[in-house]
Amino acid sequence: MAFTSIVTVNYNQPEATLALLASIKLNLNSDDLEIIIVDNGSLTDCGARFKQCMPQIIYIRSEANLGFAGGNNLGIKAASGEYILMVNNDTEVVKGITDVLIQEMEANPEIGIVTPLILYFDQPDTIQYAGYTPMNYTTCRNKTEGLMEKNAGQYAGISKETAYCHGAAMMCRKADIMNIGLMPEVYFLYYEELDWCEMFKKAGKKIWFSGKTHIFHKESISVGRESALKTYFVTRNRILFIRRNASLVNQIIFGFYFTCVAIPKQIIIYILKKRTDLIPYLRRALTWNITQAKDSLKLGFNTVA
């Protein structure tokens, strides 16, 4: 089987990263792999702990938090594998996952990125991802296929094109990345893998879902807590994604929808939830998109922990 690089990014979650390494050690043949851990500006340098678990890992430490894309890009640049599997550090792999995903890609050279079935770690009979529907460019909304369905084998063996991959687990060819480009770092977090998929599709590649294997993701089924950081980047990047990928007509329609419907609705929700402290971050996200170019690396938010 082709040599594969597994890339994961750690940010102040050493225990999760160690659990991922343990699952790799248990379930995958290390002779065909290189494991790259990028520490994304964590408060504590845990490289020695990671190497104690798997001495052969390649450990890269960034003094700054470069975001989801920036951290993964550091790992991609260091990778020597023909194939690269990027996984969140809060995932755990199963036997043969790399072999199955490589087989999918080798069977169809048009595949640019493939993501497996994703199951919730704490409720392994529940599906988190089985593909994405296409984006509605007038609202910047789409749906996750399979979300919250009980896993009764309904996606087992299914191999199909989908609109977008899932950032928790993505395999692609190193050669394709070198041709198409690294993950866009303008987002910092949220929407970057969707934009990357758009880049691959514009280059003639397909985004793929495979139900022939799966991965467990420790992201909670419950909705994550609202925060200033989440409010700002979700809002900012939703607009930015449309600016970077939609036609001018759709950008105009989206602009009216977002300012006249989506933002007022969100303000009402925050008022009802007694989270009026988050409303200024909606305004800040809008202001950033008005004042910054769509390829600006200025985040507009202090991300230092």
What are these regions (language model features)?
Residues R61-A79, N89-T91, V100:
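Glycine-rich, basic loop-to-helix element that forms the pyrophosphate-binding segment
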Residues D32-G41, I60-S62:
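Short beta-strand/loop segment that forms part of the nucleotide-sugar
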Residues A22-D32:
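Short, acidic, metal-binding catalytic loop of nucleotide-sugar glycosyltransferases
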Residues M178-L189, L194-F216:
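Catalytic donor-sugar/metal-binding loop of nucleotide-sugar-dependent glycosyltransferases
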Residues I84:
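Short aromatic/hydrophobic "clamp" motif used to bind/position activated sugar donors
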Residues S23, D39-A48, A64:
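A conserved acidic beta->alpha catalytic loop
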Residues G70, E92, D99-G181, V186:
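Acidic/His-rich active-site region of diverse nucleotide-sugar glycosyltransferases
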